[in-house]
Amino acid sequence: MKLAGSCLRVSRLVFGISVMLAAFSSPVQAQGHEKERPVENPISYRTIQVDGLSIFYREAGPKDAPTLLLLHGLPSSSRMFDPLFVRLADRYHLVAPDYPGFGHSDWPDPKKFAYTFDHIAEVMNHFTEALGLSRYTLYMQDYGGPVGFRMILAHPERVEALIVQDAVAHNEGLGANWKTRRAYWADRAANEAALRTNLLSLATTRARHVGDDPNLERHDPDLWTDEYYFLNQARQADIQSDLFYDYRTNVENYPKWQAWMREKQPRLLVIWGKYESSFDPSEPESYRRDVPKAEVHIVDGGHFALDTAADEIAIIVREFMK
């Protein structure tokens, strides 16, 4: 009888424990399943024919929501905006193309395709027309600045607001680092070999991301090693050196862009990485000189500030676009 009683008590104890475990495990399982559900606005990866070229782009968010058109920098692609896609697509329609010669878009032969900022801006304007994007907020990073400002001057009626992230529209914004690059513009033949060596090197590709940030552990090395691989593919040396030579035309156009901003006083948000090493730290205030009501935010990042400050930037963008 004692043995039977002991067995009964053990059985009740085991039963009680199993009930408790079931009670505690159910919410965990439910929570786990909830995490596995598809997001409401997944990113789509598409291509579209524009001017005889296959243009790759990322898209997410409801198409009837305000559109955010994101223009990438060098030597990046639309991939750089992935951190914003996952943070903003619940409320906004995000579209980020790869320029010709970048990312997953076509890389036409430089002997047959003019790699100039005028030409890329023209293709990007035609891209927006092909997608039916008639109104958008323009988000411009690095090369996105000269591409975007050309798009603005061609079709100012399409632009609702501007977001500038580490992109330059003032001569002083280039800073002392651009002395050797100006030498390339002055004499391409004498300086092209040195420029290519520097532009395509792993050290320079890494420096664009890390900049002066002392917190190296925050930076994912895959971001610059992937870009380094991309830069060392066939045609890239010719494509990038052509485009970098044409960068001199951006400096020539700065007064036009500044005049447009001073006249139109657009809604303007400037986001700048405090560890930016490619451009001069005076540039954000130069924008505010043109547009006194511009919002300026210095964030905890470098030239590619989304690498380390995506949460901060997403909050800033949400507040700006309300």
Where in the sequence are the language-model features?
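Serine-hydrolase catalytic-loop signature spanning alpha/beta hydrolases and amidase-signature enzymes
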Residues: P75-P83, L94
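Catalytic active-site module of serine/aspartate enzymes centered on a nucleophile-bearing elbow/loop
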Residues: K293-K322
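Flexible "cap/lid" subdomain of the alpha/beta-hydrolase fold that forms the substrate-access gate
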Residues: Q31-R46, V50-I55, A60-T67, V95, ...
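Active-site glycine-rich loops that stabilize anionic/oxyanionic intermediates
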Residues: G73-S76, D142
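Structural cue for short, hydrophobic secondary-structure segments
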Residues: L70-G73, A96
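Bacterial N-terminal signal peptides
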Residues: S11-A23
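N-terminal secretory signal peptides that target proteins for export/translocation
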Residues: M1-V10
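Alpha/beta-hydrolase active-site loop signature
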Residues: P75, P100-G103, A169, G302-A305
